[in-house]
A protein has these predicted regions:
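ABC ATPase nucleotide-binding domains
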Residues: 227-257
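ABC family nucleotide-binding domain
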Residues: 2-215
Length: 257
């Protein structure tokens, strides 16, 4: 489904280039739920943007369904994103001049053969699924951060994506709404077979995944199978990375005590 082959990405700093992603290799299978964890600045969000074709690597290849993203034109990438990819941005990226329901509908408006009525009916159902149907005529500036996040999540589902990338999807939500969102993501993954890749600081979210990738200083330092937990109770913790020990060896020692 998705393959990284020796992928490297750097950005120009004031005095020198900053290596953000360093020779990363990994593969994600169709229908897999993968969580990417690591401290701030470790390259997680950059990795996610590369995987979605929002940016191109300096070196290496990224293959989606066997197709190299670097070899596609901007138009081809746009068509790929509108037909196969969903993305939940950490900063929402809602269009300020469109209402909530119009923001949700946008991807289908530019790429679907559905009628306008069908598109808005589908958009309305998605708003209902994230408990935002009462805000459909509101503009982004009239919404709280958590409400904007839920609108962005509804938008990411509109094209029934084959693969969904989510950058901190629960970061701006309380525990109740975080649980709702993660249940929706899990349903997309398990019931519809969509591949799900989530960047998160919250180990409660990460442990829902089939597999956890850990990044540090731009490098993929560990890949391990998650000991999956059930969705409930959803215990949202902003300090989960700092307070949790991610080393499998140390975790096994703690169990033996």
């Amino acid at each position: 489904m998705l393959t990284f082959q020796s992928v490297h990405k750097s950005f120009k700093g004031s005095n020198e280039s900053i290596n953000v992603v360093k020779n990363v290799d990994f593969k994600v299978d169709q229908g897999e739920f993968v969580a990417i964890i690591g401290p701030s600045g470790s390259g997680k969000s950059t990795l996610l943007g590369l995987a979605a074709g929002l940016d191109k690597p300096d070196n290496g290849q990224i293959l989606l369904d066997g197709v190299s993203l670097s070899e596609l034109s901007e138009d081809q990438l746009a068509n790929l994103r509108s037909s196969k990819i969903g993305f939940i941005f950490q900063n929402f990226q809602l269009l300020p001049n469109l209402t909530a329901i119009e923001n949700v509908a946008v991807p289908l408006m530019v790429s679907s053969s559905l009628s306008e009525k069908e598109i808005y009916n589908k958009s309305r159902e998605l708003l209902k699924s994230v408990h935002m149907e009462h805000r459909e005529k509101h503009f982004p500036l009239q919404l709280s951060g958590g409400e904007e996040q839920r609108i962005a999540i509804a938008r990411s589902f509109i094209n029934d994506p084959k693969i969904l990338f989510a950058d901190e999807p629960t970061a701006n939500l309380d525990s109740k709404n975080g649980e709702i969102v993660m249940q929706l993501l899990q349903d997309l993954n398990k019931k519809k077979g969509s591949t799900l890749i989530v960047v998160t600081h919250d180990l409660t979210v990460a442990r829902l995944a089939d597999r956890i990738l850990e990044m540090k200083d731009g490098e993929l330092i560990e890949s391990k199978t998650s000991k999956k937990q059930s969705m409930k109770p959803y215990n949202k913790s902003a300090k989960s990375i700092k307070k949790s020990n991610l080393s499998p060896k140390k975790r096994s020692k703690s169990k033996s005590k």
